[in-house]
Curated annotation (Swiss-Prot):
UniProt-annotated binding residues for NADP(+): 90-91, 223-226
Species this chain originates from: Schizosaccharomyces pombe (strain 972 / ATCC 24843) (Fission yeast)
UniProt-recorded name of the protein: Thiol-specific monooxygenase
Binding residue positions for FAD: 13-17, 38, 46-47, 91-92, 137-138
Pfam families found in the cross-reference section: FMO-like, NAD_binding_8
Length: 447
């Protein structure tokens, strides 16, 4: 597939995926303009920790078009909340976590604190600052007369609305903006009856707020297990953890229970699959992930099966290799992949994207791209929320496949932007990552 000549590129988001995409594109030396739009006041995306919380999250939360409202404070610029909590440490060891063109500083912890990653991102962003429009919110992205019209506005009060024209747009806004809380019978009334009794992990900041409270954590992924670890020293025992199919851990501090079937807002009882009932629960914390969101009206209104990007938020539709919009590959995404090591995966995607948009690599035909999508959907057997899931060893295969494609780009540049490759060492660390983490933190690895 041949693409039109691309000279001006917009990147939406200056977080981890947006920054590495900008570096990859600039390294091609093939474009007249590369502009990043970032609504926060500094680059780094969600790694910009905010202690202030938003109080506008609906319960349940199932709308992928939900827009994140800034927190209005005394500062000159509004603050967009981050899902990070105060004591967060990464769930990925530094041997895998970083970009392959920037090492962590010596003596960095194997599983660094959030502020270490924020500083890592700050250093990585430094040479890109002239290309970033900070404190700038993108309102819409629309294809008109063969070009992409990006409508944007400064986040400072009184800023005018502006428009600019681009040949291509890479959406790098991540997938940690719209929390998902499933709609379970009685949940709405239960949450309204006692405000603050139901929250999402994105609103968790510090365990001291849960001292002596009876807590039910919903979910079994890394965020849920991490919150259980932080709550264990302070919360009332046992902490309950609701898992699909239940769980094996039953001890004084933690009891794993089946999924929730109903909330009773009058008695404050929580009914579980199999008949068990929990009572006197002070807080329910949903660690149920996030919805994919494309919060731009002109793109969100695309509804036909051949053109739509979003419907229920389970995944982004019509994207080849989790990157290129099949109907028009001058629109792309970096950072959609789930259950991966984010930085190297985004770097692999960015390296591939840059070589395609510069014309040094060609995409397969539209028919082949659609065939790839159809085969992936068929393999999921209806589990659409796993569309972007690349858990090990899929992520290693994906990263190396993109690396191999990048090696085929012609002509070869004197200084090629690096595409990561995972050899035996990286694969071994990735395969054993959870046991490595459990040993580091002194906890029982998840079953």
């Amino acid at each position: 597939m041949c693409l039109p000549t691309i000279r001006k590129i917009a990147i939406i988001g200056a977080g981890p995926s947006g920054l590495v995409t900008a570096k990859a594109l600039l390294a091609e030396k093939a474009f007249d303009q590369v502009t990043l739009f970032e609504r926060r006041g500094s680059p780094g995306g969600v790694w910009n920790y905010t202690s202030t919380l938003s109080n506008k999250l609906p319960v349940p939360s199932t709308n992928p078009i939900l827009t994140t409202e800034p927190i209005v404070g005394p500062a000159a610029l509004p603050v967009y909340p981050s899902p990070l909590y105060r004591d967060l440490q990464t769930n990925t060891p530094i041997e895998l976590m970083g970009y392959c063109d920037q090492s962590f500083k010596p003596q960095t912890l194997q599983f660094p604190h959030r502020h270490t990653i924020q500083e890592y991102q700050r250093i990585y962003a430094q040479p890109l600052l002239p290309f970033i429009k900070l404190a700038t919110d993108v309102l819409d992205i629309e294809k008109k007369d063969g070009s992409w019209v990006v409508t944007y506005k400064g986040t400072k009060a009184g800023s005018p609305i502006s428009k600019d024209i681009f040949d291509a747009v890479s959406i790098c806004n991540g997938h940690y903006e719209v929390p998902y809380i499933p709609n379970i019978k009685g949940l709405d009334e239960y949450a309204k009856a006692v405000p603050g009794s139901v929250l999402h992990s994105s609103l968790f900041r510090e365990p001291e707020l849960f001292v002596g409270e009876s807590v039910l954590v919903v979910g079994g992924a890394s965020s849920a297990n991490d919150l259980v670890r932080h709550l264990t020293p302070v919360a009332k025992h046992p902490i309950y953890q609701s898992l699909l199919g239940g769980g094996d851990i039953q001890n004084e501090s933690l009891q794993q229970v089946p999924e929730i079937t109903k909330f009773d807002p009058t008695t404050r009882e929580i009914y579980l699959k199999g008949g068990k009932v929990l009572s006197n629960i002070d807080r329910v914390i949903y660690c149920t992930g996030y919805l994919y969101s494309v919060p731009f009206p002109s793109l969100a209104k695309l509804k036909s099966p051949e053109t739509k990007l979003i419907d229920d938020g389970s995944h982004v539709h019509n994207v080849y290799q989790h990157i290129f919009y099949i109907p028009d590959p001058t629109l792309a995404f970096v950072g959609l992949a789930l259950h991966v090591v984010p930085f190297p995966t985004s770097q692999a995607q960015a390296a591939f994207l840059a070589r395609v948009w510069s014309g040094r690599l060609k995409l397969p035909s539209k028919e082949e791209q659609l065939k790839w999508q159809d085969e992936l959907m068929f393999s999921l057997s209806g589990a659409n929320n796993m569309y972007h899931s690349l858990d090990y060893p899929k992520d290693a295969t994906y990263i190396n496949k993109l690396h191999d494609w990048c090696k085929q780009a012609t002509p070869v540049l004197e200084e090629e932007f690096p595409s990561p490759y995972w050899g035996e060492k990286e694969r071994s660390i990735r395969e054993n990552m959870w046991s490595i983490r459990a040993k580091f933190f002194g906890i029982e690895p998840p079953k």
